[in-house]
């Protein structure tokens, strides 16, 4: 299984983090199998970070093999969606970026990719206009809509040329 993640895909979040609002290509990174946390299991803040941030995300499950997928056919390669949380050890990420080093470990640590229960796209609605939010202790702390993504799910699928069935994105 591969967990393919897309960073800096929302202009508002990029502005908050002082990143460029103009990207020519999505920022793609991988998460390891051990990053996956599901079935309502608890998340524990890792010992190596004192500044863990969360980002609510839409997660799409790839269900077909494909290569060199045309954008107009990309929707045929995924059929389920859920909400996820992408945890980031922000202090570690900032330190690694400042040194010009890869920062993937700050996002790909154990249990850093929380996912909910997948539902069929037919029940979820248009993947390009899905609202989502995160509540903590009854208070809404994040909300978004896939219509605000800089790169659509279909566009991202074009870059992922050899998906394995059951991959999550």
Enumerate the language-model features and the residues they cover:
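Single conserved hydrophobic/aromatic residue that forms the stacking wall/gate
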Residues: 163-169
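Catalytic-core "active-site belt" of small-molecule-metabolizing enzymes
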Residues: 1-159
